[in-house]
Amino acid sequence: PQHFQQQDRYIETLVESRSHAAQPGAWGFSQLLIDSALLAQGKLAILSARGLLPDGTPFNIPENDAAPAPLNVDENLRDGIVYLALPLRRAGIRDTVEAGESLGSARYESSVHEGRDDNSSLESRAPVAIGSLPLRLITERDGLDEHAAIGVVRVVEKREDRSLLLDDSYIPPLLDVSASRPLSGFRNELLGLLHQRGEALAGRVVASGACLLYTS
């Protein structure tokens, strides 16, 4: 298996090196949806998310990867950022653990599924081990240096009723502005202003008769 593992590492490094050189800094969310109901219980949970971690690892919750366990935010956390994180690959540390094992610093959790042979006309199936990312929600106290992490929300405080107050002005790293409600609002407002300005300028041109007639 060591040969296949080395091949995997080579391919991952090759892809990351090429993509990073072509577009450095390309990481963040292209989609993010928070469970607003759990905020009232003092917990943070992700319903769906898609994007790239800073180390180039793609994630897709819940289609390809399980959503991280909800984080019961510590009441002492104030003006702190909660991150979506994955342990960094380190020499001498297991990359993969079996389902049910302690995750530790593993980057993949293996589970067995029945796979169909797409090239056979027969209903031929076989058990296939599939690895998913054991993503988790952490804060700075959990050690960001050992993780590829991107900020999800900034928690202002945990109120006396245990609900979470989030900083609405916080914008996480993004690949698509549609993943952020504030940025989407700014974009739509700007497009609306540009449209109004364009209509006003067009009206002035027509009113002044400054139109050119082109003939072949």
Identify the residue ranges that each predicted region occupies:
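Acidic/polar N-terminal loop/beta-strand segments that form early-domain functional surfaces
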Residues: 37, 54, 64, 87
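N-terminal "first-domain core" detector
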Residues: 1-45
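Short linear interaction motifs
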Residues: 57-71
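Internal, hydrophobic cores of structured domains that mediate oligomerization or house catalytic pockets
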Residues: 67-203
